């Protein structure tokens, strides 16, 4: 993260060139003010990042691969808020390092490992989003929770390997410790040029990479959002006309027999299907009811024509008495049903009586199935468009969050790293307090990150509110 400088100025860690003489110690009022401000920032940082971690833990809506990377970043920010901020504040207020060499090295190792892990997590987030928008067909299949865990572990392990051994054991490698007891800085960073080299690798190069990636992410996201944006009236009209001109599907429904009826007979208490007649007689209006013993029928509408029932084959029953031919009123079924009319016809031939049920389609053959198919296709198309728009909205939300995080990182880390660049060429050009403020701004980035999540993601914001108000039952429904 940052680099510390001893009082004599020979080191590159100019941010901690603290005054060690009594007459340069901070006044009491100034120390109280600094302690209050930095203590408040530390508390806000700790609480904010704990809220982030709890939100991801308890709300399943936030348990995504991208948010697991944010969880890792929140862990790093929590460590900075709990330890690094307070130890550096103690160093500033006291004017010297009062905790000894061992605590100094442990603090520096922790500070640099965690800060470097933050940068690595930001790089992972940027690359992850870049591959999501540029390779939407292949990358999501490999974007699993296991892969995210491996990437997060790699970021922390690499940061530890790069900084912790060098900070803790450099004095044993060279055979002596050159850092004074009342100061705290990294021993092997004793040259401003070396410090500048580490700043290039730890800040400038990652910033360039993340900026380029974000530009590509933004362009790709805008392209996808533009593709799925709502259509204008003219576009909708043109597409509707084209849809009406091109038939969706040719109905492959067999033409019904003349009269448009299928027949079923009620015989011996059972409803059985009877074959349609081979040669139907001429139609007859329903209004002319037949009162003879040949047949009697009912119809659902006055203008619907029907044919007389054909003689149905049945078992011989000489002893069966002839039954009167009842005339039943037709029933109209549910309009949404496939059939809408029922005709009950009774025929008496000789000594047996046969009752048949005719079910007549309400619409011409093929019209209702074709309409159903069209409605199904339209429903599927609407669902697909809605899902694509929801996906585009989620992408915009994630892109906004990444932009806010990267912007906060660049704004808070740039002042210190610019001072490192200037100090390489002019070691006396930057006042000591400016160094301290610049170094503290790097810590403030850990305070800002939780606010970025809440401002750019409504689900985070609602979950934060439920946690703070102890409304635990509403956490799972926060969206």
UniProtKB/Swiss-Prot annotation:
Record keyword RNA-binding present: no
Biased composition annotated in UniProt, kind: Low complexity: 310-333
Modified residues (Phosphothreonine): 459, 463, 477
Residue numbers on the Cytoplasmic membrane side: 54-67, 128-147, 216-401, 457-479
Subcellular location: Cell membrane; Postsynaptic cell membrane
A biological process from GO: regulation of locomotion
Residues listed as glycosylation sites in the UniProt record: 8, 13
Chain ranges on the Extracellular side, renumbered to this chain: 1-30, 89-105, 171-192, 423-436
Comp. bias intervals (Polar residues): 293-303
The keyword Phosphoprotein is assigned to this record: yes
Keywords, alphabetical: Cell membrane, Disulfide bond, G-protein coupled receptor, Glycoprotein, Membrane, Phosphoprotein, Postsynaptic cell membrane, Receptor, Synapse, Transducer, Transmembrane, Transmembrane helix
Membrane-spanning intervals of the chain: 31-53, 68-88, 106-127, 148-170, 193-215, 402-422, 437-456
Single annotated GO MF: G protein-coupled acetylcholine receptor activity
Comp. bias intervals (Pro residues): 274-285
Pfam families, sorted: 7tm_1
Chief location of this protein within or outside the cell: membrane
Cellular component annotations (GO), alphabetically ordered: membrane; postsynaptic membrane
Topology in membrane: Multi-pass membrane protein
Disulfide bridge map: 104-184
Superkingdom assignment: Eukaryota
Region (Disordered): 271-334
Function description: The muscarinic acetylcholine receptor mediates various cellular responses, including inhibition of adenylate cyclase, breakdown of phosphoinositides and modulation of potassium channels through the action of G proteins. Primary transducing effect is inhibition of adenylate cyclase.
Family classification: Belongs to the G-protein coupled receptor 1 family. Muscarinic acetylcholine receptor subfamily. CHRM4 sub-subfamily.
Protein's recorded name: Muscarinic acetylcholine receptor M4
The gene coding this protein: Chrm4
């Amino acid at each position: 993260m940052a680099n510390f400088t001893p009082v004599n100025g020979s080191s590159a860690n100019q941010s901690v060139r603290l005054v060690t003489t009594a007459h340069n110690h901070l006044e009491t009022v100034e120390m109280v003010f600094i302690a209050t401000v930095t203590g408040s920032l530390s508390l806000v940082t700790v609480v904010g990042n704990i809220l982030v971690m709890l939100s991801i833990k308890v709300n399943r809506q936030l348990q995504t691969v991208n948010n697991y990377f944010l969880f890792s970043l929140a862990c790093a920010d929590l460590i900075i808020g709990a330890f690094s901020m307070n130890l550096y504040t103690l160093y500033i207020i006291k004017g010297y390092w009062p905790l000894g060499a061992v605590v100094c090295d442990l603090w520096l190792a922790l500070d640099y490992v965690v800060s470097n892990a933050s940068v690595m997590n930001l790089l992972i987030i940027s690359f992850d989003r870049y591959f999501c928008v540029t390779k939407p067909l292949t990358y999501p299949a490999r974007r699993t929770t296991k892969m995210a865990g491996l990437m997060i572990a790699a970021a922390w392990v690499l940061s530890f390997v790069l900084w912790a051994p060098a900070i803790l054991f450099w004095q044993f490698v060279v055979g002596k410790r050159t850092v004074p007891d009342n100061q705290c800085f990294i021993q092997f960073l004793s040259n401003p040029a070396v410090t500048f080299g580490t700043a290039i690798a730890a800040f400038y190069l990652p910033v360039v990479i993340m900026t380029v990636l974000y530009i590509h992410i933004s362009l790709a996201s805008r392209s996808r959002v533009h593709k799925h944006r709502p259509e204008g009236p003219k576009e909708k009209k043109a597409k509707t006309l084209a849809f009406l001109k091109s038939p969706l599907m040719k109905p492959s429904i067999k033409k019904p027999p003349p009269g448009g009826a299928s027949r079923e007979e009620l015989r011996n208490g059972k409803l059985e299907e009877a074959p349609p007649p081979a040669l139907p007689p001429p139609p007859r209006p329903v209004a002319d009811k037949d009162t003879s013993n040949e047949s009697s029928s009912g119809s659902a509408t006055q203008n619907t024509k029907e044919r007389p029932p054909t003689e149905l084959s049945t078992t011989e029953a000489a002893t069966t008495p002839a039954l009167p031919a009842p005339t039943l009123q037709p029933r109209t079924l549910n309009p949404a049903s496939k059939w809408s009319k029922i005709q009950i016809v009774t025929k008496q031939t000789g000594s047996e009586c046969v009752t048949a049920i005719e079910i007549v389609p309400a619409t011409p053959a093929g019209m209702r199935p074709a309409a159903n198919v069209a409605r199904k296709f339209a429903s599927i198309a609407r669902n697909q468009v809605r899902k694509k728009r929801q996906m585009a909205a989620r992408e915009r939300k994630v892109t906004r969050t990444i932009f806010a995080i990267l912007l906060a990182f660049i704004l808070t880390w740039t002042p210190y790293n610019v001072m490192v660049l200037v100090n390489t060429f002019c070691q006396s050009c930057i006042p000591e307090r400016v160094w301290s403020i610049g170094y503290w701004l790097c810590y403030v980035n850990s305070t800002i990150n939780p606010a970025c999540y809440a401002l750019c993601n409504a689900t985070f914001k609602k979950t934060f509110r439920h946690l703070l108000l102890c409304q635990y039952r509403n956490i799972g429904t926060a969206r």
